[in-house]
Amino acid sequence: MHDIGKITEGFQNNIKKGKRSNKHPHPLYALPIIKNIEFDYLFDIPIEVFAILSHHTQLYNNLYADYQQYKKGTFLIEEIKEFIKNSKEAYESLGFSKFFEFEDLKIEDIPKDAKPLELHRLRRKYWIEANNYIKSLSFDDKIKIKSIFSFMFSILQLCDDFASLNFSEYAKDREGIFDDVLENPEIYVPTLNIDNPISFILKDYEPYKFQKELYNSKNKFVMLFAPCGRGKTEGALLWALNALKNFKRNKIILAMPTQVTSNAMYDRLVKIFGEENVGLFHGKSFIKLRDSKEIEDEDDLEEIRDENFKGNVFFKPITITTIDHVIYSFVHGFSQADFALGNIQNSVIIFDEVHYYEKYTLEHLLTLFDILRRMDIPHLLMSGTLPNFLMNNLEGYELVVDEEGLNYKPFKLKCSENHLIWKEDDEWKVNENIINEIIENYKKGLSQAIILNTVERAREFYKAVRDKVPAILYHSQFAYKDRVKKEDEIFTLEEMRKSQNKPYVIVATQVIEISLDMSVDVMYSELSPPDALGQRAGRLHRKGKDWRENGKEYKLKIFLPYKHLPYSKELIEKTINHIKFYEKPLDYRDIKDFVDNVYKDYNLSIPSDLKLFFDEAILFGRHWTDISTIDEEGRFFKVRDDKFMKIEVVPQVYFDELGENSLRAEYMAKIPAYLILNEMKNEEGLIHFYPYEKRVGRKTRRYLICSFKYTYEIGFDYKEEEEFEDIL
């Protein structure tokens, strides 16, 4: 029924001529026909009709409101009668009788024409009645409508997309009403069939006790508390594979904190499950997928676009994505959000490192978890510290704890009242004692990480150490392609450490906390809140059991930061007041205790405004471009706090070298917005930035070229303003 609006003279003529039918909106043309057919709808509003209306453009308040642009459609009445008459036969021949009962369709009258003004009035009537009905419902009933509508819509969209894909070839030299277009329907709903998940995931390793508990769990909602490097991901996959069977689902979604962690998890799971079973989506996933394959021609690029689309809507049995994409699925945050949310209804979700997020995002996540529970969507929350302020806001979850791993003390914490780097007379000074210590440690074969809280301090410390020992600098303000290359370089250094005992030195910002699978012997870090310190420590003596092992002493050496930013002054002061009680060999229970003491009075505002935007988008709401950009940078609704807002720029050095080819996403870098805002205030105007416009199709896209010195080694070399010192 969804395409019955195509049975008009104009639309059929355009098909025969190979012309587009933008002025003949067949989903809207279907409305006056469907209105006259007797249906037993699921609810008091016809969500089935809204699925038909939106199967080419996602529902929003003003969908089809610009009716003046459309042409009148003249219905082919006899063909429509024949189509409706054959509905019972189609129902039986396609095997739908196994799933639901259906009687012949009865239509009262078939109109002669679909007139734009009449269509507009009819559409407006449906919208008003549906909105009034939704407003009268409780939140749980709204969730029920959203859940069932999106699930139904995803089935329609899936069938329509693949039928359209196969239709051109099928329809050659054929006339009249067609039979079913798709064969082998099982390929359109791919599933995982793994007989022995434990041996499949763990190979020859014996599962830890907590991994067995996860595998045997029959609960839909689970929290896991386990240290870094203890096999949380493997345990989560065991839970998820069993949950697919226990709760009759067919997809696993892993929601990661960042694009970097998503890429790393994708590489990891492709090796386990195979490329055909694993999808990826985030704002720059197309680049990652493209770079993972050898591209020879346009057909290869089309295959990458198809893979990216499948990740976007959670099509494959396993999809790795960011928490941003999952959240935007619930608020019409991208063009296929309803399709994606429909697939989420049939999924189990794993959330990694849920304690990691700053307050603003964490409030959104806790609001999301409440919606997921009400939708009855199984999910697992993983954390290395699981602080009380988080646990106190989560009810109805089974708690699984890695008791064995929590007893290990993999490092010793030591705190100094000195700085690693500071300013005197507007010049940066570094702690020469630590520089010398790093040199001596390197000679002893020790790998080391030095973590600073701002990009500029990391840059300046790196400059001081790079001529003394081989070192690499890593932060978030590199162009995307350079950041990926740096990650590959760090991965190679880590492999050489493992295989050849070859040491390395990395200077980084707190981006290291979550993004890199690496392990050093000594870590120097500026003081940060205890949850951040715990994350950093996850890259120190990873998988270790005792701080004295292998003839080494593994130490986390903390230094006072030159400035409290990017953290609040109060939070840094609380951390300083408590850290003296933790100068000892630490296990992860100690770290949790440290976190709980510092955050004792930490209050989260729940629900966040995610609930308001979700409520607004039960069926309609805003157009997705009002919610988010195509790269999932928030507009009206933001997943991340823009307190430290960044802008995307193209380094001048790449623009000079590559011209317009440098305007591709992989050459862009994110830098603090205040850099351009401050220059806009100057009398001379912009000094280091200028706009560049490029025509893309019918639109003109504007880019910013940045002339600050940029190199692969350092990134942008600019001076930060202390009141805006930038995170990451």
From Swiss-Prot:
What EC number(s) has UniProt assigned to this enzyme? Answer: 3.1.-.-, 3.6.4.-
Root EC class? hydrolase
Using the record's annotation, list all stretches that form the Helicase C-terminal domain: 434-592
Q: Which SMART domains match?
A: DEXDc, HELICc
HD Cas3-type domain boundaries: 1-163
Q: Name one GO biological process term.
A: defense response to virus
Instruction: Recite the UniProt keywords alphabetically.
Output: Antiviral defense, ATP-binding, Helicase, Hydrolase, Magnesium, Metal-binding, Nuclease, Nucleotide-binding
Query: For binding Mg(2+), which residues are annotated in this chain's numbering?
Result: D3, H55
Q: Which domain of life is it from?
A: Archaea
Q: What does this protein do?
A: CRISPR (clustered regularly interspaced short palindromic repeat), is an adaptive immune system that provides protection against mobile genetic elements (viruses, transposable elements and conjugative plasmids). CRISPR clusters contain sequences complementary to antecedent mobile elements and target invading nucleic acids. CRISPR clusters are transcribed and processed into CRISPR RNA (crRNA). Cas3 plus Cascade participate in CRISPR interference, the third stage of CRISPR immunity.
Family classification = In the N-terminal section; belongs to the CRISPR-associated nuclease Cas3-HD family.
Name of the protein in question:
Putative CRISPR-associated nuclease/helicase Cas3
Record organism:
Methanocaldococcus jannaschii (strain ATCC 43067 / DSM 2661 / JAL-1 / JCM 10045 / NBRC 100440)
Instruction: Kindly list the organism's lineage.
Output: Archaea, Methanobacteriati, Methanobacteriota, Methanomada group, Methanococci
